[in-house]
Design a protein with these regions (language model features):
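Sec-dependent N-terminal signal peptides
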Residues: 10-13
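Flexible coil/turn and secondary-structure edge motifs
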Residues: 2-5, 16-238
């Protein structure tokens, strides 16, 4: 993995920030304005929350985007695509586990549709035309992938990718893989809510804060200032 190791750099971030910014000044991905999906789910008359697992590079930024999205009740950073036994940060970083850094997005379909979730995913959460890398991070664990849980999710995602490619919305073809969800394994606690807890960490400032800003700018109706966080969800009730 190409991100600076957390064990030492959180303490050294202030000292390294000047040189780090100079090296990664162009790392942030630009947002792309894209049309809404023609094929989408209809809000069910009843039922509960739904979930989709998305991979789009470093999970810090993807998680932050959905934590600020109205209708999302939880966004958890984790790993998908490999075995439970190898779902650990250090092992995933070897690029031999099959895992992708992913975010499990739980949402209320009465407030936001899967199609809108995917519109945000393709436009501000990551660049879907980059094969096995995102910004400064490279390797299969940073691949663009939608881990679909059922046929409806697969159908909507397939149709949307075809729609965007046919419209030539991006300068290059979309490389997002559709993979059947076989398991999602939450990442270590120190990865959860990383942007919320470390908003001035250099990697976050350069690569991920712009994503949240683009969400607010391009999806004002879906944006919320106060994020829904994992730590808040796990906080014991009084």
């Amino acid at each position: 993995m190409t991100r600076i190791q957390l064990t030492s750099t959180l303490a050294l971030a202030a000292l390294l920030s000047v040189s780090w910014f100079a090296f990664n000044a162009c790392a942030a991905e630009p947002a792309v304005v894209i049309p809404a999906p023609v094929v989408d789910q209809t809000a069910p008359a009843g039922g509960g929350l739904q979930n989709v697992v998305l991979a789009g590079g470093c999970f810090w930024g993807v998680q932050a985007v959905y934590e600020h999205t109205k209708g999302v009740t939880q966004a958890v950073s984790g790993y998908s695509g490999g075995a439970k036994e190898t779902a650990h940060y250090e092992l995933v970083g070897t690029e031999r586990t099959g895992h992708a850094e992913s975010v499990s997005v739980t949402f209320d379909p009465q407030q936001i549709s899967l199609g809108k979730i995917l519109q945000i995913y393709f436009s501000v959460a990551h660049n879907p035309t980059e094969l096995n890398y995102q910004g400064p991070d490279s390797g299969p664990s940073y691949r663009s992938a939608i881990f679909y849980a059922n046929d409806e999710q697969k159908r909507i995602a397939e149709a949307y990718i075809a729609q965007l490619d046919q419209a030539h919305v991006f300068k290059a073809p979309i490389v997002t893989k559709l993979e059947a969800l076989k398991g999602f394994y939450p990442a270590e606690d120190y990865h959860q809510d990383f942007l919320v807890l470390h908003p001035t960490y250099p990697y976050i400032v350069v690569n991920d804060q712009p994503k949240v800003g683009n969400l607010k700018r391009l999806f004002a109706d879906q944006y919320r200032d106060t994020p829904v966080t994992v730590m808040a969800a796990n906080k014991p009730s009084q």
